[in-house]
Amino acid sequence: MSLTRLHIETFRNITSAQLLPGEGINLIYGHNGSGKTSILEAIYFLGMGRSFRSHLSQRVIQHSDDKLTLFANLNVLDKESKIGLRRFRSGETEVKIDGDKVKRLSTLAESLPIQVITPESFALLFEGPKSRRQFIDWGAFHCDKSFHSAWVNVKRILKQRNQLLKNETSYSQIQFWDKELVRYSEVVTDIRTRYVNSLNEQLKGIIGEFLPLVDVKVSFTRGWDSKTDYAQLLEMQYPRDLASGNTGSGPHKADLRLRVGTLPVQDALSRGQLKLLVCALRIAQGKLLKQQIDKNSIYLVDDLPAELDAKHRQLLLQQLIDTGAQVFVTAIEPAAILDSLITPPSKTFHVEHGRVTVIE
């Protein structure tokens, strides 16, 4: 899978731009504030319906306009597909895939699997469990079609259950919701567990390349004791949940744990090593996606020279090339990337004041 054409309108400081990306590495360079990261953000927005830089989508629309427009041509297994998105300042979103209107953003995400490696993505190991659940669920969503609906149902039931707890509802009235919660939680947990097990197999060789002589163990915690029946646990914890007004255990508390020996990786590894570990995790996800559903991710790598030294830049870029994925990588100076590549990028773009120029 790859983008063969990308059109951006009134997105951040880009009034209008059209790119014809190539396979493999696409280098985008320019000074800070030029708009190079906005190109990556636009691709992400097209695939996810939101930004990786701001939770307020209206902020990416140019002040002089009331909407942004993004569309792209995709090459998917030698077949062309078209996707388009329009976001209005009012919050309304219009999405089309091959000319047909799409109501759910999950359909958009399924069409364009995107991996992001930015300075902020390294927070995966430092933030709370939510970001690591999202990491697992990206893969679970793309690799198993039954995951999304099951997880949507879990979140819907949890919302209802928590409201009943806040209303001090008796357990006999909550039991119906608990049966449904257990049913969907088992589906979600089974898919997550199988996905993490498969991811572990992919990770072994990749971590060895990035962190030789470091033995990183990855394990999945489901959000409650695996030896305890979830239905019994919900009943047992009802008094505590009633007091707090929230469901204390379940798949919404799941986490991905990474350790070196008995220590969390945050305590055992240097900051530089942790960055390499996150890169390894992202590459493993891309390789697993290709293995399981024969679809490549699109990688967005922002400000790579600022995050890794020359040796590890070269290693990361080569690993990305080996995945067969299309990659968009930004830098202030092109030499920082060009010097790390054995062969030139398939396309090079220069960005200045929101204007994009192809470098032949």
Curated annotation (Swiss-Prot):
- What Pfam family is a match, any one? SMC_N
Could you tell me which PROSITE patterns the record lists for this protein? RECF_1, RECF_2
Q: Which domain of life is it from?
A: Bacteria
Localization, per the record, is: Cytoplasm
* Residues that, per the record, bind ATP: 30-37
Biological process according to GO: DNA replication; DNA synthesis involved in DNA repair; double-strand break repair; SOS response
List UniProt keywords, sorted A-Z. ATP-binding, Cytoplasm, DNA damage, DNA repair, DNA replication, DNA-binding, Nucleotide-binding, SOS response
The molecular function GO annotations come to: ATP binding; single-stranded DNA binding
InterPro entries the record matches: DNA-binding_RecF, DNA-binding_RecF_CS, P-loop_NTPase, RecF/RecN/SMC_N, RecF_2
Q: Which residues cross the membrane?
A: none
Give the main location: cytoplasm
Which is a Gene Ontology cellular component entry for this protein?
cytoplasm
Tell me which family the UniProt entry assigns to this protein.
Belongs to the RecF family.
Function, as annotated: The RecF protein is involved in DNA metabolism; it is required for DNA replication and normal SOS inducibility. RecF binds preferentially to single-stranded, linear DNA. It also seems to bind ATP.
Q: Which PANTHER family match?
A: DNA REPLICATION AND REPAIR PROTEIN RECF
Q: What is this protein called?
A: DNA replication and repair protein RecF
Query: Which organism's genome codes for this protein?
Result: Shewanella sediminis (strain HAW-EB3)
Supply the source organism's classification. Bacteria, Pseudomonadati, Pseudomonadota, Gammaproteobacteria, Alteromonadales
Q: Which gene encodes it?
A: recF
